[in-house]
Amino acid sequence: MKSSILEKLERLKERYEEVSALLSEADVINNQARFRDLSKEYAELEPVVVAYKGYLQLLADIEEAKHLIAEGDADMREMAEEELEGCEARLEPTELELQKLLLPKDPNDEKNCYLEVRAGTGGDEAAIFSGDLFRMYSRYAETQGWRVEILSQSEGEHGGFKEIISLVSGSGVYSKLKFESGAHRVQRVPETESQGRIHTSACTVAVMPEADELEEVNINKADLRIDTYRASGAGGQHVNKTDSAIRITHIPTGIVVECQDERSQHKNRARAMSLLATKLKTMQEEAAHKSISEERRNLVGSGDRSERIRTYNYPQGRVTDHRINLTLYSLDAVMQGDLEPVIGPLANEYQADQLAAIAD
């Protein structure tokens, strides 16, 4: 392992021991905020330091085995050779695990996220496919124990959605869905196609981590235009009876958000403000991170909706992710929500890029 990585691990070990000592001091125990912050730091350092101590012990065991091979009798040498073989086999996986523990944590990974699916080129077929994509994500969310709340939707004339916006809540939502932003292309024979010709259409997906609180983004109320209107689409008897739906326009940026799912105008307004804050924060972060690494831009997405990331080919039963040249012939399972075989390799590739950056 590189000396720079070992030096970093040694510093973390020293800090861990320092924090451990501080947590037993009376003045720290009596200061709730300080105690909470140190406890959090201790919990973050502990898995790294425990793994590092295991690594140091492994190195010590290797040296001990080598010493016995050089100095011991025949029986001892045979045992030591077996021990050395076992230790050396564990060395590389242990080093890799340590390096993974050192990877910077994405502060957004544990956040809920807004999921937007929009029909692109392809007319009615694109709208139908946007419905298929949203159903795919909803079923995947079920397997993860997440909750999906639809905030607004515009239905297609022949099914599906021109646009559907939802909030996905649960554990580690953004860490899994962050690889989904971009253009998704479908190749299939539409039900309305009498000649059996394959059509190509596309939908765009945007995934944005939910802003923690509105305070994260400075929103001047004078910059907002707020309109109320009657909700449309499915929703029961209350639809079209009250102006409960909310549309908020952020005049400086032109961002428009809507929420029509809740029966209460107050709740719709709160949801719309949260979505607006998230969009503004995402815009600010994209502007601040223009120098982001090419690898991360390719995998997590640049926010450019025209960036084609995946093709769903129905005649061949094929799903291809163009960012990592991944091809799977399990389209039916993927569309039923079995996304792990797609998301897993993307996450692994992303992690490999980060590890390469550490090694540089």
Swiss-Prot record:
It is found in: Cytoplasm. Coiled coil: none annotated. The keyword Protein biosynthesis applies. Transmembrane segments: none annotated. One of its GO terms (molecular function) is translation release factor activity, codon specific. Its main location: cytoplasm. SMART domains: PCRF. One of its GO terms (cellular component) is cytoplasm. Pfam families: PCRF (PF03462), RF-1 (PF00472). Methylated by PrmC. Methylation increases the termination efficiency of RF1. Keywords: Cytoplasm, Methylation, Protein biosynthesis. Peptide chain release factor 1 directs the termination of translation in response to the peptide chain termination codons UAG and UAA. Belongs to the prokaryotic/mitochondrial release factor family. This is Peptide chain release factor 1. It comes from Cellvibrio japonicus (strain Ueda107) (Pseudomonas fluorescens subsp. cellulosa). The gene is prfA.
